[in-house]
């Protein structure tokens, strides 16, 4: 006996767990009571229907792009004192330039995200990395405060896809019950790219001079551009909203998924048990099809060479570009978007405080550390970020599934937010250790420990906020990310300005 869900319009509320195995929809293969949200189509070009190997290969290159993109914009921080001595640009002005970069890293998404949503993820990533490579090379030759500010503004705009596009690609490739894990991986690559790069660039600045930081990063950017062009496939796929969700069940149907087992006949004969569609196991190990008739794929898979093109991905069925570019401002009316923006805004603000003050604190008495040792302090951040990502990636999905089972199989976007309580404790403790501890000139171990505690909360807040938007505003998630980033990076500029 099978049933089909009846929808009701609560954004983000979906039937995630088929507690009695009666829904006539596609399920996961490893956990066969997990309903696939969104439901994959029969089109072979649908990224949701790709094999696990193909998905992993593509997301790996996206994360590689993100890691080195974050590295390119973060490599200078250990060398601020050297840059000041060489160019006359003060550390305060360098910090202000860093703040301007983060401001336009957010506002630049109005351009780059709109381009990616209309013309494709692949051309956006390739064009962005090409431009970042040349701007990074230019940075080695800046000679004045004004030129440095312009340089930082431009690199902020062209590198902005790392802020909002990676989340959209995760949405293209993965189902609701898998997104938390990959959001955690994304947070790790983003923050560790920003933190590991200064570890290396501190030694580069000490041995070769600060300009070699930009030379080496430009070479890396060129290599990443070529690899992205060769190996990353386009993931943009038009999916009508009416076909994407298995939404929550109304109250009158909750008995089908609650504890009242007498409401349905759960006994099935062997020939009535759900069977995967023909070829399903060989096509995609993430998908099991239950009691669905076999369909003939009328769409043909793209030719191999067509996957290399950087044009022709626009779909006429999508909304107009002008209207789409204004949506991020419209979404600022919603409290959930404002909440997500303030959450990640507070996190980035404190990251800017750390990035702008670490060299000043550790390069002066009583510590007097060189650029190489200052760079090593970012290893504390890497440890903290890794712990935070482990919590946010694994626990986020596990918690949402567990909460859904407790609520008759229905998942709400707010179920993931319980993990934020960890950040509420760790973040203020880390800030006190780092800031107040430095003012009292405590041992450097205490400062490193405070840095690690602050860093634990970076992926927690980022992953929770963006996954919350993705779950709540599925059809407008790309624009919702832009809305949150506008709030976040505007807040970060205020914290980055010298007092």
Regions found by a protein language model. Name each.
Residues 1-54, 235-324, 400-412:
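Intrinsically disordered, low-complexity terminal tails of fungal membrane proteins
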Residues 55-75, 153, 332-333, 337-351, ...:
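Pair of pore-lining "gating" transmembrane helices in MFS-fold secondary transporters
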Residues 65, 185-189, 220, 229, ...:
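Hydrophobic alpha-helical segments of secondary membrane carriers
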Residues 70, 82, 86, 99-102, ...:
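C-terminal transmembrane bundle
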Residues 91-92, 176-186, 371, 475-484:
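Loop-to-transmembrane helix entry/capping segments in MFS-fold secondary transporters
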Residues 191-243:
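Helix-loop-helix hairpin linking two adjacent transmembrane segments in secondary transporters
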């Amino acid at each position: 006996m099978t049933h089909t869900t009846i929808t009701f319009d609560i954004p983000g509320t979906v039937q995630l767990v088929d507690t009695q195995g009666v829904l006539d929809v596609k399920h996961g293969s490893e956990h066969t009571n997990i309903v696939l949200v969104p439901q994959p189509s029969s089109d072979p070009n649908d990224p949701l229907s790709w094999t696990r190997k193909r998905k992993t290969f593509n997301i790996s290159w996206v994360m590689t792009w993100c890691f080195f993109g974050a590295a390119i914009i973060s490599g200078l921080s250990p060398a601020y004192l050297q840059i000041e001595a060489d160019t006359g640009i003060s550390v305060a002005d360098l910090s202000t330039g860093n703040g301007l970069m983060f401001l336009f890293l957010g506002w630049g998404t109005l351009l780059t995200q709109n381009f990616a949503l209309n013309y494709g993820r692949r051309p956006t990533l390739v064009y962005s990395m090409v431009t970042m490579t040349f701007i990074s090379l230019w940075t080695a030759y800046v000679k004045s405060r004004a030129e440095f500010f312009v340089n930082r503004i431009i690199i902020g705009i062209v590198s902005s896809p790392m802020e909002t596009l990676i989340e959209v690609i995760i949405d293209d490739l993965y189902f609701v019950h898998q997104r938390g894990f990959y959001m955690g991986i994304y947070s790790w690559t983003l923050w560790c790219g920003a933190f590991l790069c200064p570890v290396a660039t501190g030694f580069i600045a000490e041995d070769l001079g600060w300009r070699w930081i930009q030379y080496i990063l430009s070479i890396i950017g060129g290599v990443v551009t070529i690899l992205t062009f060769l190996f990353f496939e386009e993931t943009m796929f038009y999916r009508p909203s009416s076909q994407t969700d298995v939404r929550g069940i109304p109250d009158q149907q909750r008995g089908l998924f609650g504890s009242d087992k007498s409401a349905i006949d759960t006994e099935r004969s062997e020939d009535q048990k759900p069977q995967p569609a023909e070829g399903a196991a060989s096509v995609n190990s993430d998908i099991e099809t239950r009691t669905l008739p076999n369909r003939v794929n009328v769409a043909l898979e793209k030719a191999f060479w067509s996957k290399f093109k950087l044009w022709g991905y626009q779909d006429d069925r999508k909304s107009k570009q002008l209207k789409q570019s204004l949506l991020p401002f419209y979404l600022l009316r919603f409290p959930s978007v404002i909440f997500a923006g303030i959450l990640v805004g507070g996190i980035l603000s404190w990251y800017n405080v750390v990035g702008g003050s670490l060299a000043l604190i550790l390069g002066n008495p009583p510590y007097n550390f060189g650029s190489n040792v200052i760079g090593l302090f970012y290893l504390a951040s890497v440890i903290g970020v890794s712990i935070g990502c482990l919590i946010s990636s694994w626990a986020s999905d596990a918690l949402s599934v567990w909460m859904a089972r407790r609520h008759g199989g229905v998942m709400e976007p707010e179920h993931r937010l319980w993990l934020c309580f960890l950040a509420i404790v760790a973040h203020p403790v880390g800030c006190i250790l780092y800031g107040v501890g430095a003012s009292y000139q405590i041992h450097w171990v205490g400062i490193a420990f405070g840095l690690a505690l602050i860093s634990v909360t970076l992926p927690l807040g980022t992953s929770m906020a963006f996954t919350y938007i993705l779950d709540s505003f599925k059809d407008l998630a790309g624009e919702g990310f832009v809305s949150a980033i506008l709030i976040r990076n505007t807040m970060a500029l205020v914290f980055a300005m010298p007092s």
